[in-house]
Design a protein with these regions (language model features):
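Extracytoplasmic metal-acquisition and chelation regions
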Residues: 25-26, 42, 55-302
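Acidic/proline-rich low-complexity IDRs
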Residues: 5, 15-18, 25, 42-47, ...
């Protein structure tokens, strides 16, 4: 018997169709091809004037005068999480606009002219793009310079974060959805938080954190050290996805308290689906005897 991992399932599979969350949890690995962390390309935003972008930044983490919360998401998974938590019917009085990596904007929820709350989301990564390195576009750099919230995965997944925030003058709140920013958190969280006090932006790790696992693979050819100390692909576990969704929901509630009930109900519904997904995954794997399991995967993340 052969166990095909979730990321390799057919998109039209009845099992996957049962769960709206499957596109994020099960199919996401196709967005991250294998890449050495040392192969970073220069960020496109470095060509911009950092002082000019910094002048656009602000430190507010709640809705501005127009009642708009501006958010940026680093990965496709986080972009999908936020979309599912913020997408509601017109009765919610929440207007939500999501701009993808292709620059196209989609509208969800209440009519913008009638809504009492507004949320805009800029998604940095495109499908099939590496989550480790990213060249910011001019529009993305501008969005980050004005953002109230910058949602990231953490556990050292996104190597481009420092360059992105430094070059844009980001002064909002970086929400670490996994609850673990990186290996430094594991080594000495108190010391890491002390260092962050000097940063021009705040860091919010939420109330929950994922269970980090040591990176099981040896160094790549020609390298003396492994690419990671801990496995950053945390969202491939539904249990870890629950942590991320919970932390995202809490951050959105804090930024737009008048929509707290909407976000909370969407988080509860999403978590319920993730729990069912976890049960299905465990049952599927356990149906094959352990000594006969063969794993086919497109990435070293499962």
């Amino acid at each position: 018997p052969v166990v095909v991992p979730f990321g390799m399932q057919q998109e039209g599979s009845p099992q996957l169709a049962k769960f709206r969350v499957s596109e994020t949890i099960l199919g996401s690995m196709r967005t991250i091809p294998s890449m050495s962390r040392r192969s970073a390309a220069a960020l496109a935003c470095l060509a911009l004037s950092a002082p000019a972008l910094a002048a656009c930044g602000h430190s507010s983490t709640s809705a501005d005068a127009a009642g708009t919360v501006k958010a940026v998401a680093s990965t496709t998974q986080i972009c999908d999480y936020i979309t599912q938590l913020a997408s509601g019917d017109a009765s919610s009085n929440l207007s939500f606009d999501r701009t993808g990596a292709d620059g196209k904007t989609q509208h969800f929820g209440a009519d913008a002219a009638k809504a009492t709350s507004h949320l805009t989301l800029t998604c940095l990564l495109a499908p099939n793009a590496s989550a480790h390195e990213h060249d910011m576009t001019t529009a993305q750099s501008k969005a980050l310079s004005e953002a109230d919230l910058f949602f990231v995965s953490g556990v050292d997944l996104e190597h481009f974060l420092d360059s992105a925030v430094d070059s844009t003058g980001f002064k909002g709140t970086m929400v670490v959805t996994s609850g673990v920013a990186g290996a430094a958190d594991v080594d000495d969280l108190a010391a890491q938080k002390k260092k962050e006090e000097a940063k021009p932006y705040k860091v919010d790790r939420g109330s929950a954190k994922v269970e980090v696992a040591k990176w099981p693979f040896p160094p790549e050819e020609g390298e003396s050290e492994p690419e990671f100390r801990f496995d950053p692909h945390v969202w491939t576990s539904p249990k870890n996805a629950i942590v991320q969704v919970t932390n995202i929901g809490a951050a959105l509630e804090k930024a737009a308290p008048d929509q707290a009930g909407v976000f909370r109900s969407h988080v509860d519904a999403y978590v319920a689906k993730l729990k069912k997904l976890d049960e299905w995954a465990a049952g599927s794997l356990s149906s094959v005897p352990q000594d006969k399991r063969v794993l086919f995967t497109s990435h070293d993340a499962f």
